[in-house]
Amino acid sequence: RQEIKVVVLKNENWNEKITNLQPTFFKANQLLYTYTNKTNFWGDNEYYNFDTKFLRNRSLGIQQIEKKEVYHHYLYPENYNKYKKYTYFPDINGQFVIRTLEANDAEIEADYAMMHFSLNTYQPFSGKEVYVYGAFNNFELTPENKMSFDSENNTYRASFLLKQGFYNYS
């Protein structure tokens, strides 16, 4: 006797999953799952991304760089618009890749940079918290990646250290 449990993940994120699915049909040596709506996730736009493979130069997603105790990378601000239409832009489903052009073994030689995230809004989201997340933090909503609202600029902000590489985030 064998037991099979099916889990459908949204973008390899274990926090967004569908479980307890039962086969809709049984064939010889096959279990068929022919759901339509039950296995769909609510769509959203693609992940944002940035690349810090070279700390001293701006690259994808980086608006400004400052050299302090570590390099500070200020990402282009994202603009919140709940009416924004879906736009196809290939991403890596919230994942990240440690990489650098400044060393041979990125896993042990890549440096860290202070990443500055910002989300422009017209007003704070009433009763809601805003986070930066992706595979780099196991898609977890933690105090470290929670954004705080800057009422002077109507912008949510968060800053934390990340190792050099290519990142998807939301």
Label the predicted regions:
Residues 42, 109-111, 152, 163:
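Solvent-exposed loop and beta-edge segments used for protein-protein assembly and interaction
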Residues 3-5, 112-114, 129, 168:
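Extracellular structured ligand-interaction cores
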Residues 2-84:
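Long, internal scaffold/assembly segments composed of regular secondary structure
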Residues 45-47, 164-168:
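Extracellular Ig-like/FN3 beta-sandwich strand-entry sites
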Residues 75-126:
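Basic K/R-rich, polyanion-interacting modules in nucleoproteins and related proteins
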Residues 37, 49-50, 88-90, 98, ...:
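Intrinsically disordered, low-complexity regions enriched in small/polar residues
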Residues 13-30, 116-163, 170:
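Aromatic-rich carbohydrate-binding modules that target alpha-glucans
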Residues 37, 102-104, 134:
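Short, well-ordered helical secondary-structure segments
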